[in-house]
Amino acid sequence: MTPPLVPGFDETFNPYPSGPDGTGDLEQAKAKLAECGQPDGFSMNLAYVNQGLGPDLFASVQQNLGRVGIKVGGAANDGSSYYSTWIGSPKNIIDQKIGIAIAGWGADFPTAYGFWQSIANGNAILDEGNSNYPSLNDPKVNDLLAQLTKEGDKAKADDLAKQLDQQVMANAVYLPVQFDKTFYYRNPRLTNIYLNGGVGNYYDYVNVGTGGK
């Protein structure tokens, strides 16, 4: 789950393999459904933004989960309130019978704490504008996050970060489906142009000038 540039990333860690060809392990999925008392599948809704890639993502998940009997309905919402009161409201998640919510996330700072604090800390769950979409409240996760704020030794902090990633994934509440990379083009005529971490690692347009060659 942890992105490649954040401490805790381990490309060998894959607790939920999706078959040899990456298209899904149907037999294992059916076995897990039987194990939890739902051998014929179940019904739930998937939350998504009703524009851009949202409808296509919904259709893809609906089709793929349907292969093992899981019936997926849509819980679409406008992008303007999607993160604040749609999937950002634990009550609305329950009211809309949302079992999966499509969301994007990135660390404000490239640290394990910066990546996980808002989306995995059970002490940070809000009534609205909540970023811990599954309302995960695992004491082990909370404790690892607390330890990260105090650990000054990099090697020990990196080990805590790996433990944190593995503990979150043990709860099976997040499914990483895509890691975005953005290509930035800088026109050679621009001067004093740089990425500002304070504005989300975007160009700081306030200080941009022209006159370059």
Where do the PLM segments sit?
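Ligand/substrate-recognition segments at binding pockets and active sites
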Residues: K30, A34-A107, Q117, Q178-T182
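Proline-centered turn/helix-capping motifs that create local helix->coil transitions or kinks
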Residues: M1, F109-A112
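Long, contiguous, secondary-structure-rich segments that constitute the structural scaffold
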Residues: L33, Y205-T210
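Extracytoplasmic/peripheral linker and loop segments enriched in polar/acidic and small residues
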Residues: G22, G73-S84, D95-Q96, G104-A107, ...
